[in-house]
Amino acid sequence: MAAMQPAAQLQFQNLMSPSGPSLPQPTPIHQEKVAKLCPQLQHDFYPSEELAVLPSQEVPRLRAVVESQAFRNILVDEMDMMVSRAATVIQASWKGYRLRQKLISQMTAAKAIQEAWRRFSTRRLMHSNRLTVKKAKREDEEDIPYHQPQQVRFHAPEDQPPVMVTKETQFPSFDNLVPSQATAGPCASRVPGGGLHPQYVINRLTVPKYQPCMLTKTFRSSCLMRHLEGDSLKIRHVASKTIKVGALEAAATGRYGQAMHGSLKTQTQAHTESDVPKAPLRIYPVNKTHTKVCPMAAAVPESSATMSTAPRSAPQARPTSPATVMKMQATTSPTSPVIRLPAPVGPNSSLSNTTPQMQVRYMMPGARIQPPGSAVASTIKALPHFGAPVMKVPLQTGPGFTMTKTSLQMRPMTRSQAQTYTVSTSSKTSPSSPTVKPSPQTRLAAMLTKTPAQLRSVAAVFRTLCGGTTEAVASSPRCSPQSPVVAGNTPSQVHLNSTRTKVTVSTKQATTVVKVNSQSYLGRCGSQGNLDTIVPKPPATYPLEVEKMKSCPARSPKKEAALKTNTTIAARALSWTKMMEDRSKALTQIKQRAEIIKVHFRVYMPEEIPVTLTQAQLAVPLTKSSSQIQPPPCHARTQPTSPFCKAVSQSCMPSGLAHGTPEGQRPPVGLSASLSSSPLAAHLMSLTAQLQPACEQARSVSRDHLTRSCPASASLQARSSGTIVPPEVYPNTYSPTSAPQHHMASLLAKSSSQLHPPAEHAKTMNTKTTKAACQVCPSTKLSKAPSLAQLITCLAKVPSQAQLATETAKCLLAAHPTTDHRSKTQSQTFLSSSKASVQLWQHLGTLSTGSRAKPDDRSVAQPQLHSHAPNKTMQNPRSVVTDSQGMLIPLMTPSGHPVCNAESWGDSGRAQTPPPSPVPNQAVPCHDDLAASVASLCADLVAMLGSPEDLRTLLVKTLSQGEVRTALSQALSREVLGPSVVKALPQGMLGMALMKALSWGELGISLSRALSRGELRPELNKATQGKLAEVLCKALTEEERATLSQALCQGELGAVFTQSLAQMAQRTGTFLPKATSKTVGSRMTTAPAPVEVTCSGSLSVAWGPAMGPVGARCSKGPVDAGLASGQSWNSKVPNVSVRATAHAGAPQGVWYPSRGHKPWDPIGAEAELDRKPSAELLMSVQGMEKVVVQAVVTIQACARGYLVRRTVKVWHQWATIIQATWRGYRVRRNLERLFRATTIIQAAWRGYCIRRARARQVLLPIAWPEHSGRTKGTLDNRNSSEHRCFLSCQPDVCSVCQSLGPPVESPPSVVMLVGSQPRTCHVCGHTLSTRVVQGFGQGISGQPVSRWASASQQNTLLSQQHRACTIIQAAWKGYRTRRQLSQKQSAAKMVQAVWRGHYTRSCLTTDALLGTGGPWSISRDTSRHSSRAYSLHWPGV
């Protein structure tokens, strides 16, 4: 590199020459100058801008120089040199450090060796001196056969008596117990006060008092060792030498003291702990200096003599004073009192005070920190926090449990705010959600679906039967939008809707109330305010009612959906299973119903909505919804009302009307008065009263709510009028319902003539209310048709009210359809503003409701009407009309808002004027009108027959009452029917239909047939959907209406009816004549399907098996009444209307299985009716239900048992795993503890063994060879034989003399000179001077052979072992050091290489290469010029 530097300089000079002085000539860069160059260059270049910015013409050449390979090579070489030099310096430093460390260690070792050698030499010299002295003594006393007792210490000067030492205070020691005068001087001179007088040493040796233990023994051994070793030092000459070594020993002792504090923790600490507390060491003020140096109080004096390798630690531990020990422990173990932190080491100490401190220590930390306590407290606190949220959650679910208490339906009844707001919400949403709530049949089907195949087959049948209902429910969402209007007023509706039980209960109560309530009761009811009051628990109702209640509560999918669904459920909630359950649980459910009703009242309290509907409108919605609505307050009551218009209204009236009729609904005074004479009047009054309260409730309660309550109480009314009512109440929402509208239309048409005066009132109310349009439509219809009062009167007079109702419905339909059918939108928005739509709904509702509800109403309501007002004039048709009218009037009244509603039947007469006989007002309807009415009746019958469950429910409920039974018997009698009706419909037809509907066997057959013909339903629907509308539209003209009025007045309804049937048959060109004739008589007309309102608003008559779920086809919203077989009247509340019909027919009965309506072909209707069911099909549904329930229970039990067993099995598995894990952990923990204990024990035992072996080695007598040459017994051997007393004789005497002396190999451990006296041997006769000594203890056993050889061999072996250990340790340490050094060197090389590369790369920058500073010293100001440099000099960079 040195050679290359000049070249580099030359190259730079040559390259830079053009620039002249502008650029300073770079100087060779050496590593040692780099640091200096950087600042210098910076100072030189950067101050001047002209230098900083190179001329542009010179930049290319400079750049070429910088980029040249030679220049880069130079830079790299320079850098390598610098880095190499740095590495060399680092390595040299490291090596020097290592060498110094090694030298220090070697010097320390040398010093230690020297000290050890000095000690060894000193001991040897002392031994040699002692032997010399002993030899001199023996020579002086050769005449005495004296076996040298080494344990007796004689004073050097013989004139001094020997110092007697007791066994308690002295171990075997040297002969001389007192240092010679000569040694005292040096000792004092070298280490003043450093020597420890023998007395002190003796007094300090109190180890024998210690309790024997392994550690104590070890200490004894160590102490003994020190004594044995120290004995050699305590000869005359030892004192001085001990002092000489004193300084060094003091240092050594200091080190050992430190070791005591440090390393002694392991072994010495344990010894110290065990010994110190047991033996209070006496610390004498002998060596204060040494005490300072080493915590051992008197360790120094002896340590100087006893620095042998083996006993080093033991001696230190032995002499430690308690204070020192405490210090040591404090240092070594945190358990010492000084240490505050409780350390696990502390417990190891055996000091009594240390352990207590340990305990206290632990307790104190616990008190201070309180980790466990704090943790516990915090945990406890946290737990409550967690718990609180948990508790809150249940509270949140409170509404749920409230529900559970009362039942699903009752849940919304809770008085909490939730009900209120929920009601409103649900009422709003209920329109869309009504379909959510599955009907009881659907639930049963779902339940069965989970059961075996047989049950699933049954479930399929049920689902098929319920199909219509389901469809209705599906279509109901469209209509539901209207319900929100009321929903706002009735927040609790949603809750009621959500609770099926409520609806069911209402139905049941209604049924019960039906008996109790009378027309007068309805009259009594002043306003819907009664709804608010809690209805008294209704008497036990029929099992069907109970079943409905039960079935309804089963599910509450959504509060919103619940309203519609509940209503629908109320209608079809009665499933066979539920019927069975109801029968068995009738009483219980009645009680529940009463309770639920109470709750409902509260819930429905908000039903009173400012929305004012025309009485007519209210009558309709209230007919349906008043039953429903009133039941909401008292669901059970109202719902029964709708099934039996009269009974239902009465029942509703007891609960709701008792409180008072709503303002809109005026008590049907006039109407009741006019109708009081006839059962129809009574029915109408009761219905009116019910409808009025219902209307008010409808206002307040969401339409869905009304629908719910209505299904049970006013299912028929709901279908006929109730279905339309919702549209009227909620014209916008409800109008879409075509089927309900058709029913409503039919009902309204039929009852419009009767309700015409109410209609007028309705008009007035409509004008008053926002829904005047609805009222206007009814008013228009009513104006065309005879007044309600007149119609009622006519009906009372006319033999067949059913026909009249049909005709009236036709007339009203004819009048209204023109207006209503014109706009489907208006019909859909019935409530909103379209009078025509209201009328259309009424018409449609009348038609569809009539078609559906009429069959039930006629069969059921007629008997009721007759029973209430036993008027034989009211024939089966009339009774049907009464029911239909009850429903129709409400339907019409809805159009005429509250006026018609309140006065539609009973109120129309009261509020406005008792309806005079409508004969003059109503023109006798023409044959076409009659045919249309018959067709509507047929449609109603078909609808009712399509849902035999509803029909049977109605029949069961009505037939259970005496009045209804009477009315039915009258209807079946020729006198009531009349010759014309008999001709049209054979007398036995109705009875046969009733019997079939009422017989489970027939019902099963009908269901099976309906199912088998399920494929025909859609086709028939399609084929006949538009026929009924056409027929009805064409049938009722003004002339026909006049003819109908005349026939009603003159009692010629029979002839007119027959003619109208013929005309209708001709017009329709279908099987209507046959089916109609049969259907009209039996009220079970199969041919006419319920009228369906299309989007256009035109009525489409679905002929054919309308009874079956014809497939609700709501063009926009309303479901065809034909769908009524299982569908709701209103498309908005299709389920509700269907349910309403079903419940109206049997609100209390559970006829859910029959929900799927039979599609009776008009042609085959007769055959079906006449045909007897086979024995197999006559199997009791109850039995079937029992079997199903039993199977379901069994399956559930099996499934639950399996689940429980599986869960238990899983738990067992988990428990097994946990137990195994825990047991394994415990075993491992115990094993670990055992290992630890074993290790400790082994270590302790090995240490003890080693220390014992070493102590023995040290205690072995070091026999020095005899120099006198005599072999008599010159060897000073000690043998392990106890001597109480022995006589030492001269060795060369006889054997007896020798035997008297102690054997050579067993001298005593301690001897005391008792005295000397001449003694004569009795064998040899020699008299010898003898010394009597007393020996104590036991010496070390030895071999009779010479000890010097063995001692020397052992010493040699020990030294060799030490040397070998030293060599091995040195080799290992050297290897380890070299390996670590090599690793560090490799790491350093790697780091250096990486750093070189990084540094080189970082330095090879534009500024470094072209800048003013050195290549690796970038100026601090580079940032200022970097951008400029890059931009100017290195545009490409």
UniProtKB/Swiss-Prot annotation:
Q: Where is the composition biased (Polar residues)?
A: 861-878
User: What are the protein's UniProt keywords?
Assistant: Developmental protein, Repeat
Please give the tissue specificity annotation from the record for this chain.
Expressed in testis, in elongating spermatids (at protein level).
Null mutant phenotype? knockout male mice fail to produce offspring, while in females, fertility is normal. Males have normal testis weight and size with normal spermatogenesis and sperm count. However, they exhibit defects in sperm morphology with abnormal acrosome structure.
Q: Which GO terms describe its biological process?
A: single fertilization; sperm flagellum assembly; spermatid development
Segments for region (Disordered): 332-353, 416-440, 848-878
Keyword Lipoprotein annotated: no
Comp. bias intervals (Low complexity) = 422-440
> IQ domain: which residues?
84-112, 1190-1216, 1217-1239, 1240-1258, 1361-1389, 1390-1413
Quaternary structure?
Answer: Interacts with calmodulin.
* Its biological purpose: Essential for spermiogenesis and fertilization. May be required for manchette assembly in elongating spermatids.
Official protein name in the record = IQ domain-containing protein N
